[in-house]
A protein has these predicted regions:
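Solvent-exposed, flexible loop/coil residues
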Residues: 5-9, 42, 81
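Metal-dependent nucleotidyltransferase catalytic core
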Residues: 16-57
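Catalytic cores of NTP-dependent nucleotidyl/adenyl transfer enzymes across multiple folds
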Residues: 69-146
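Active-site nucleotide-donor binding segment shared across nucleotidyl transfer reactions
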Residues: 1-23
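A short acidic-to-branched-hydrophobic micro-motif
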Residues: 60-67
Length: 146
């Protein structure tokens, strides 16, 4: 897994640019409806992305199709912030996040807990995207990780 923090049961998230989420949902339905644990739904708010969850060949997947280009989607931005933080750290952040993930926390709440980000962990991580590497290193150091 790309971040190296997967735990048993972690799914493979695939973020897709879907200019027409209905067409995306139709394609996903056509190809994966027979997969184990298949679920397909649309959010009722925002850009109303189409989300599919299923198990294929023993691997749990989540496909997320949104109107926005991938690099503008929150899931991708979270991934990029997490990747940057892990690259700036010598391994302590990865271990701390992995321990919380093993205890059942999802990825973003685990990062927020380790980094001392208050409030909504998803918004908190989004706020880090504009920070320079030096600021991220300082944040890691303040948490005893840098």
């Amino acid at each position: 897994m790309p971040l190296g923090i997967a735990v048993p049961g972690s799914d493979i998230d695939i973020v897709c640019h879907a200019p027409d989420p209905n067409a995306f949902a139709d394609i996903v339905w056509t190809h994966y409806q027979s997969a184990d644990d298949f679920v397909l739904y649309r959010w009722a708010t925002g850009t109303r992305p189409a989300i599919a969850r299923f198990v294929w060949d023993g691997w749990p997947f989540e496909l997320f199709g949104d109107l926005r280009p991938v690099d503008q989607q929150q899931g991708w931005i979270h991934f990029e912030v997490e990747r940057r933080l892990l690259a700036l750290d010598a391994g302590r952040l990865r271990r701390a996040v992995s321990e919380l993930r093993a205890d059942g926390l999802k990825t973003e709440p685990a990062f927020a807990a380790v980094l001392g980000i208050p409030g909504d962990p998803y918004r908190g991580l989004l706020e880090l995207v504009a920070e320079a590497d030096a600021a991220l290193r300082a944040r890691l150091a303040a948490c005893g990780l840098g």
